[in-house]
């Protein structure tokens, strides 16, 4: 094998795979993810309008 014959055997870009084939487990997982995302968004909105949870008052230095 000479130097010119060597090289990459695989093409740089792989053909795209069809991701449209999903079974029941995949569908259930996607649905669960959507529900968790909605719950997270609702929790973010609820937390954003609340304000600070705990105020420690005036912070004091360690010196006495």
UniProtKB/Swiss-Prot annotation:
Basic and acidic residues: bias regions: 27-44
Q: Which residues form a coiled coil?
A: 21-50
- Recite the UniProt keywords alphabetically: Coiled coil
Q: Does the keyword Coiled coil apply?
A: yes
One Pfam match, by short name?
TMA7
> Do you know which InterPro entries this protein is assigned to?
TMA7
**Could you confirm whether the keyword Mitochondrion appears in this record?**
no
Q: Which domain of life is it from?
A: Eukaryota
Q: Where is this region: Disordered?
A: 1-64
**Family as reported in the entry's similarity comment:** Belongs to the TMA7 family.
Protein's name in the database: Translation machinery-associated protein 7 homolog
Question: What species is this protein from?
Answer: Aedes aegypti (Yellowfever mosquito)
- Name the lineage: Eukaryota, Metazoa, Ecdysozoa, Arthropoda, Hexapoda
